[in-house]
A protein has these predicted regions:
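Extended alpha-helical scaffold regions
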Residues: 1-562
Length: 562
């Protein structure tokens, strides 16, 4: 498991180091062709070939960027870009950046942002070549160098959704490149030489450097600390750069991005430490401004807790965000975001099924109903223990876990060497803890049927020896209590509390069982179903009003002739 800690000061300052052009195998650079008349003619022809609707979109996007019209930019980005992608570029890339340059007067900033969209679409719909992966990294370096290395704050303003997507896509492409690089047996000799000659491209240090630099430049950590103390964060801690929404939100989203990267590397303790100044109890926190960011925070927090064996905290995190998703699913207007949120929700249901099976606890009834519908059979099998339980936990983990990466490149001189898949390694880490925990649901299912029971009788039921049963009971006792987060900034801290409703005492060969029953919350059930009924009544009343207003208004009867 990757455990190296990166401190903020290690990544301070200029990040020009990550922006070096990579060495292409043919020895040429893009600048060699800038004055080529033939290429200029091709660019003009390519610009004319762009569909009229797309050219209008690019023109509006360019003008709104120049005028810092954030609301119109948000509409262009969140609605029009997706619709045009589906209409014209469902199975093709967007127009080449050099063709678009002719439409916007070679504006460098706009073209850098356009390339970010261009490569993002390529990653989502096509199979990017190694050359495209290198170019995309180079473009991100240009963008982040422009933002971080300016003498003063930029006047640039972008919608929060776009800023989040920039950070999120940057990390996704890093993960994708690491996976692509590790499969040397699928790479050609030329590609291997290109990878070997460019170790700085999508380097782990470079990616962490960018995220830490954005955090430092925005002073977002100081702003969050000041906000917890009740101070005016913007005035006291933001500084010249952090007062601008561009830097503030990029810095904040980079904190969430770091949580994701640390989980991908397998350092779950550092992932939770990264969020020490983020108040997850604040329903108006900055992470709630973008739904995808909100879901991402709780997904990785819950996953980190699960990998640390804190199943009660993981359950709490998953239930919180799944409840939010269930209650707001009708308000997601953007199809792309709706699909990604739903996909992540399905993964969290699988992880929640594992956590609740290993550490039985009560959850919100709405989430419990959905969980039972999706994974009732798997949960039942896990609670019985045995090899079948391990197999099911493995399947759920492979489906729902994030994509792990190996931070170091493979041995390019020996491509035939077998490399341990990081996904398999992290699965072993999870199962090592889960196998010890399996005794809890198995014993609980038998003990809850009795108030007292003879040790030999239970051993006969379980078909194990008395000594082995004593060992299992001691394991249950140890697993019965866990550290549980009690709120506050320290996600790693908490109180040692019981995590299940059943305890026991062993005296000689007699087991005395005590179960703490929690009364059913009937009020919640009535309130929820009353709200559903009210929504149904409102919907019917609206339809009735529309019908009366003219939709179903009867036509006047025609006069009959005598």
């Amino acid at each position: 498991m990757y455990q190296e800690n990166y401190e903020d000061e290690e990544f301070a300052g200029n990040i020009d180091v990550v922006a070096d052009s990579y060495v292409n195998s043919n020895g040429h650079d893009e600048g060699d062709y800038e004055d080529d008349e033939h290429l200029q003619q091709q660019a003009q022809a390519g610009a004319q070939a762009i569909p009229e609707q797309v050219r209008k979109f690019l023109g509006h996007l360019y003008r709104n960027l120049l005028s810092s019209n954030v609301s119109d930019l948000a509409y262009n980005y969140e609605n029009q870009f997706g619709r045009l992608s589906e209409k014209y570029y469902a199975k093709a890339s967007w127009p080449e950046p050099q063709f678009v340059a002719a439409l916007v007067g070679d504006d460098g900033l706009f073209l850098t942002l356009y390339r970010e969209l261009y490569y993002r679409h390529m990653y989502s719909q096509l199979h990017p070549t190694l050359e495209a992966r290198f170019r995309s990294f180079e473009n991100y370096c240009d963008l982040f160098n422009y933002i971080l290395n300016s003498d003063g704050p930029l006047e640039l303003e972008l919608p929060n959704q776009w800023l989040w997507d920039i950070v999120d896509e940057f990390i996704y492409q890093f993960q994708s490149f690491c996976t692509h690089r590790s499969w040397l047996n699928k790479r050609s000799a030329e590609e291997i030489e290109l990878l070997k000659a460019n170790p700085q491209v999508w380097n782990t240090y470079s990616v962490l450097n960018v995220l830490y630099s954005l955090i430092q430049k925005s002073s977002i950590t100081q702003q969050l600390v000041a906000a917890q103390d009740g101070a005016d964060a913007a005035a006291l801690a933001a500084g010249e750069f952090g007062a601008r929404p561009l830097y503030k939100m990029l810095g904040y989203f980079s904190i969430v991005g770091l949580v994701r990267v640390h989980c991908m590397l397998g350092d779950y303790t550092l992932a939770l430490q990264t969020l020490e100044n983020v108040d997850l109890n604040n329903s108006r926190g900055l992470f709630t401004r973008v739904t995808a960011c909100h879901v991402t925070v709780y997904y990785y927090v819950g996953f980190a807790y699960m990998m640390l064996g804190r199943y009660a905290d993981a359950t709490q995190a998953f239930v919180h965000i799944l409840t939010f998703v269930a209650r707001t699913k009708h308000y997601h207007q953007r199809a792309g975001q709706f699909d990604s949120v739903n996909k992540k929700a399905e993964q969290m249901y699988a992880l929640l099924a594992s956590c609740v099976s290993l550490c039985p606890t009560r959850v919100d009834e709405m989430v419990h109903s959905a969980l039972r519908e999706k994974y009732a059979d798997q949960q039942h099998k896990v609670q019985r223990g045995g090899d079948e339980a391990v197999e099911i936990l493995s399947e759920l983990f492979r489906f729902a876990s994030p994509k792990f990466i190996t931070p170091n490149p493979p041995n390019y001189d020996a491509p035939e060497e077998t490399v341990v898949e990081p996904q398999d390694f992290q699965l072993k880490v999870f199962l090592r803890e889960a196998k010890l925990q399996l005794v809890v649901p198995m014993l609980r299912s038998f003990l809850k049927l009795y108030t007292t029971m003879d040790l030999a009788q239970l051993a006969a039921v379980l078909d194990v020896g008395a000594d082995e049963l004593r060992t299992q009971l001691m394991v249950y006792k140890l697993r019965y209590r866990q550290v549980k987060w009690a709120g506050g900034a320290d996600l790693l801290g908490g109180e040692v509390v019981p995590t299940t409703d059943l305890d026991f005492a062993l005296q000689q060969d007699m087991i005395f069982i005590a179960e703490s029953r929690v009364g059913r919350r009937y009020a919640d059930w009535f309130i929820r179903n009353t709200n559903k009924m009210q929504d149904l009544i409102n919907s019917l009343e609206t339809r009735q009003k529309n019908f009366i207003a003219g939709v179903g208004k009867p036509e006047p009867a025609a006069e009959t002739k005598a």
